[in-house]
Each structure stands twice: as C-alpha cells, then as structure tokens.
UniProtKB/Swiss-Prot annotation:
It comes from Klebsiella pneumoniae (strain 342). Pathway: Amino-acid degradation; L-threonine degradation via propanoate pathway; propanoate from L-threonine: step 4/4. One of its GO terms (biological process) is L-threonine catabolic process to propionate. Keywords: ATP-binding, Kinase, Magnesium, Metal-binding, Nucleotide-binding, Transferase. The record marks 175, 236 as: Transition state stabilizer. It is an enzyme of class 2 (transferase). This is Propionate kinase. The active site is at 143 (proton donor/acceptor). GO terms for cellular component: cytosol. GO terms for molecular function: acetate kinase activity; ATP binding; metal ion binding; propionate kinase activity. Mg(2+) binds at residue 11. Its EC number is 2.7.2.15.
Length: 401
C-alpha cells in the first residue's frame, strides 16, 4: 500500500467517466483513464492511454467499481484521501468549489435543467462515489464558477427582464476550470502581479471559448447560457443570428429541437467543410488544397481573432494572449493564422518558437519585439480540481506552497 495520500478526480460525461489519480503532495498524475459506453451494450475501460478492456454493460456505479478495481491493483485504493468532481453547471448558486453535502447536491439538482446531460451525469457519479468511498471527503468544482465575477452588463442578454428574473436566462460561461488554471500559470510565466494584469485566454479544442481575465478575475467570456454561444467549434455553430434560424425553421419546417441539434452537432468545422470536425484532418486537407476545408479553417480563425480582439476591450491593459486546449496547444497553423489577424495589437509571432512541440510545455511564442506577449500554456483541469480538493480538505502540501 502506498504511504502517501492521493486525490481521485472524476469527470462524468453523458456516456463516459474520465478519471485521474494525483499525488496530493505534488499533484503529479499517477494514473488516468476513461470508462466509455456507460449504460450502453458495450463498455470499455482504458488506463494511461492503453488498449481498452471490455467491461460488462453497466451504469456509473459499475464503471466506478471497475475504476476502483484498477486503483486496488496498483495499491492506490487505500490512499484515496479526497475526491474532486467536475460539475458542468453551477448556475448562479456556486461561485467557487465546495465540499459536497446534501445541500450542495440539492442545489446542483436545482440548476441541472441548465445542463441536463452533464449535470445529471455528475450527480450519478457523486452518488456512486459516495457509496464506494463513504469515508472520503468529496469536492465539487464547477465549470461555470470562475465566470461568476462577470458584471451584469457582461452576463445579461438584451431580452425582456422577466426571462432573467424568473428563469435565470443569462450568460454563465464554461471552461472556467481551464481558464482559471491557465491564467494563474500565465501570471507566473510572464512575471506579472495578479492585481495589475490583463490576459486574453483562448481555450481551443473541439469545444472552444475565449476569456478576458483582469487582475485574476474573469470579466468576459465567449460562451453563454450554454456552450453553443461564441466561437465556431468542431460541430457547434457558435454565434448565429436567431433570425436566420427562425427563417430556416419556416423554410424547412424543422422544429426548434431539430435546429438546436443541427447547431450543436452538425455545424462548425464539420458543417462548413463537409469533411470532418477534427482539425487534424482539416489541416491535412488544407495542405492538399481542399477548398471547403480551407474555408472552414479561415472561418474558425476569423471568429477566434474577432473574439480575442473584442475581449481585450474588457481589460484595462493587455499583457498577454494565451493559447491552450488541444488545438491551441498543438496547432502551429491555427496559432500563426490567428496571430496574423491580431497585428493591430502589435503582436508579432516568432516562427521558430511557434513551431516548438507541445512536449516543451509552457512557452512564449511571440517575438522579442512584439508589443504584446503571446504564449502557449498546456491546460491541466485535473490538477486544478485536485488543488481545490486539497485546499478545501485542508491537506497542506508543497503543491499549495
């Protein structure tokens, strides 16, 4: 049995559970994996990126039992001192991470209509983990809480007041755990004091969002009440004129639910290219001269640059533009194209720095002469969740020093 405490981080999706085990002293990852096919006929568990192993068809508790078995095989099960759960939506009830209690569970349930697929999955994971680890303190970390510092003028829609007052219709933002982690690392990398800083962070993956961070606090973000607003993404449309959607509905007799599905699952890079939602596929097609792949990438880049520029207006100063997420960390092409469109800020990209692989880790990619610095910082949401669990669980470690 290991002689040191570990933190188990759990991220329950609608059909999967991603998990990581981190050393509570250093927050280094000791084990990670994913259970897929929750509540499906075929379920699998893969560890550390290895080959998936078939599991008996099972729900969240069965999948967590399989994960617990994997921990036991590695003498980690008895070392689990804290469990951190990623929860997609905290509404306006949760402004920070919290220790899970019955009241917290009830409040999560209360706001779950805002993100039914993800929140109810998280609630199932929490209930299962509580049964499997009854003596372990558990913490909820919300994807929306970092953005609860937005001012009303930044989170309100231009809709009748009653929709906000009676239904809670407003902008909440997402990717908050990633934006919070990356903004902290950016301050260290750029040598900036938190209370005198202005950053724009571009979290670019299959889901993508921009966040303006002023003096360590989120002051604007591109996603809204749902993750559909903002940037064009892998399969999501991003910002679309509602009038255009109403016109399409009238012409095609599609329902609101039909169009929501189209905007979420058949649009974005996939919709324009007609080829793929995977940027790696589209980049290959770009180099092969595929016209619609090139158009999809150009549209993607245009939206990113426009949102970065717009979010800079929420800052009192612009110290850095930071790329993160799977695309932001790995795509030399996207970073170059976005940076070219931000020349108005005096941003100059260093070609050699930009071409460094992500294995280099945190790195500056702007030229020395650039008026605004630009960096790549690999996100680590699991580490951020573990740090929150450690802080709330009052385990004093070197990772918090």
């Amino acid at each position: 049995m290991t002689e040191f405490p570990v933190v188990l981080v759990i991220n329950c999706g609608s059909s999967s559970i991603k998990f990581s085990v981190l050393d509570a002293a250093s927050c280094d990852c000791l084990l990670n994996g994913v259970a897929e096919g929750i509540n499906a006929e075929r379920a699998f568990l893969s560890l550390n990126g290895g080959e998936p192993v078939a599991l008996a068809p099972r729900g969240y508790e069965g999948a967590l039992q399989a994960i617990a078995g994997a921990l036991a095989q590695r003498d980690l099960i008895d070392s689990v001192a804290l469990i951190g759960h990623r929860v997609a939506h905290g509404g306006d009830l949760f402004t920070e991470s919290v220790i899970i209690s019955e009241e917290v569970i009830n409040n999560i349930r209360q706001v779950s209509s805002l993100a039914p697929l993800h929140n109810y999955a998280s609630l199932s994971g929490i209930a299962s983990a509580q049964r499997l680890f009854p003596q372990v303190m558990q913490v909820a970390v919300f994807d929306t809480s970092f953005h609860q510092t937005l001012a009303p003028e930044a989170f309100l829609y231009g809709l009748p007041w009653e929709y906000y007052q009676n239904l809670g219709v407003r902008r909440y933002g997402f990717h908050g755990t990633s934006h919070r982690y990356v903004s902290r690392r950016a301050l260290a990398l750029l040598g900036l004091p938190e209370q005198e800083s202005g950053l724009v962070i571009a979290h670019l993956g299959n889901g993508a969002s921009i966040c303006a961070v002023r003096n360590g606090r989120s002051v604007d973000t591109s996603m809204g009440m749902t993750p559909l607003e903002g940037l064009m993404m892998g399969t999501r449309s991003g910002d679309v004129d509602f009038g255009a959607m109403a016109w399409i509905a009238g012409e095609t007799r599609q329902t609101l639910s039909d169009l929501e599905r189209v905007a979420n699952t058949a649009s974005g890079l996939l919709g324009i290219s007609g080829l793929s939602s995977d940027l790696r596929v589209l980049e290959q097609a770009w180099h092969e001269g595929h016209a619609r792949a090139r158009l999809a990438i150009k549209t993607f880049v245009h939206r990113i640059a426009r949102h970065i520029a717009g979010h800079a207006a929420a800052l009192q100063r612009l110290d850095g533009i930071i790329f993160t997420g799977g695309i932001g960390e790995n795509s030399v092409l996207i970073r170059r194209l976005v940076s070219e469109r931000l020349a108005v800020f005096g941003l100059e990209m260093d070609v050699a720095r930009n071409q460094q692989p992500n294995s280099v880790g945190e790195r500056l990619i702007s030229a020395d002469a650039s008026r605004v610095r630009c960096a790549v910082i690999p996100t680590n949401e699991e580490r951020m969740i573990a740090l929150d669990a450690i802080r709330l669980g009052r385990i004093h470690t070197a990772a918090l020093a």
